[in-house]
């Protein structure tokens, strides 16, 4: 059997799990399709032990379909629009990202949490949830159970943010503009930002959704420097251990991140030439679906019992990151005179 045909059974299995997960994600956007995909994968893994025929396809999906999803994610970024509208929120974005990364790095040893999970929780909390985790996992060579743990933590605090933040913003007296920045900087995943801003708009008959989404997209750009920095650090560390040869920047750069940037530049150029942003909608949708397929594969490679037993430290780290990001976002708004 050829290499491609050997991958087919595993690919089809991930596709079959992704379809109901996608549907459930549409019904319950506050949870999201990637979380349903991981759950379905983990539940099936409890009973599906003899997977010789599907092993290659599952591995291919969790790695290469995931990287393809990140590349396609670039077609959702119009850099001109993001830079024009998102610049006001840039100091807050930088502050919240730096806070989450410092908290994750500082508490990793104290919580006795593995480095990869702590890194994924910090990056997922500060940049763009599941998409940031999807982009970072291949760079740091994270194991599937580490990815599943981080995604689960992000989901928990996404849900809490969507439920609590509209009432919190009202209690604090945030303006519509202030809440758009708050939701865009303090909520992790795009779907949860949408849910949070929509709930605020329903309460106040306003339109914060567009502003919150653009702030969120501006945060997404941080994927580029963060993943590049991590890939260089990891490659240099591995190089120093293995060999004394000169370090190669070109070899250490993750190609799929380069293609992500290229996709963003293509989108920016085409829209500046008058092409409608809706033209890229199908590619953005395909990106989201590929992430769901990859999460199904990751779920299939994750031990649910082990995840439950060892997930406490990751949840604690996620909660501290979440509170820290929330406080810094509000404090920066106060210092900049937005709140």
Curated annotation (Swiss-Prot):
Predominant localisation class = membrane
Q: Its membrane topology, per UniProt?
A: Multi-pass membrane protein
Which residues, by range, are in coiled-coil regions? none
Q: Which domain of life is it from?
A: Bacteria
Would the keyword Membrane turn up in this protein's UniProt record? yes
Q: Which cysteines form disulfides?
A: none
Q: Where in the cell is it found?
A: Cell membrane
Sorted keywords for this record are: Cell membrane, Membrane, Transmembrane, Transmembrane helix
Q: Which InterPro entries match?
A: UPF0324_pro
A single GO cellular-component term on record: plasma membrane
TM spans (from-to)? 7-24, 28-50, 57-79, 84-106, 118-140, 150-172, 256-275, 290-307, 314-336
Homology family: Belongs to the UPF0324 family.
Q: What is this protein called?
A: UPF0324 membrane protein SpyM3_0740
What species does this protein belong to? Streptococcus pyogenes serotype M3 (strain ATCC BAA-595 / MGAS315)
Lineage of origin: Bacteria, Bacillati, Bacillota, Bacilli, Lactobacillales
